[in-house]
Amino acid sequence: MIGTSTALSSRSLPFAGPLLSAEILLPLTAVLLVAVPVFLQAPLVRQAPLAAALFTLPLVAAAVLLERHGRGLWQQFGPLLVGFSGSWLAGCLFWGWFREHPLLHLPIEAFALPLALAGLGGRWRLAGAFYLASLLGTAATDTAIALTGLMPLWPQVLSAPLSEAPLLLRQAGETVLEPANIALVTAMAALLIGVCAQLWKQGGPARVSAATLAATLAVDGLFLAAALLAPLSSGLI
């Protein structure tokens, strides 16, 4: 199971109170890393995909510096940032150059899968915990899109003229709201919430995985809602 090998350090940051230990701050940071950049990354990648992808370099550099020279929680933020860097780069690659090919989404997002799995057994376990949970959330979202019949609309929306894309998104919204699809999405959400709960109970890096998975699902849902309700401001079209 993700991140079961070692518990998180209980040392706090200089500004952290007794309740803001690693068990709270690291999952909270994971949530912020998932949520904060998403609605900024989509339009940035659309306008300057190469610049967005190259931003991975300073992210990784900062992560390595933290891991090697940081102390306490600062050191643990390094591997967490490495995991985020992998997800960031994958998103830039797909949405920058392959966005009209939905079948390539998951393979591109999984480009660092071997490294993430290998990292679970060493000092980069937090990187693997974050990346793998983010990948699982992405896989769940793509599966839901495929099972609800939205996958064929994906390339149509992205390649359509600006005047037609909102209409296609409205059609997608109507498809999602069909009773069978609502039941399917609800069942998948309940299953994944159960997975998050089990990971959270394990503590350690698994708690980071739980927070990352939950945040990924929530953000994907919000992004889909934004695309359906306010397509021009979502960065999708």
Q: What residues fall within each predicted segment?
A:
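Transmembrane alpha-helical insertion/packing segments
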Residues: R11-W97
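Cytoplasm-facing juxtamembrane segments at the starts of transmembrane helices
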Residues: A16-T29, P102, W124-T141, G203-T216
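Membrane-helix interface "capping/anchor" motifs
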Residues: H69-P79, W97-L103, L120-F130, W200-R207
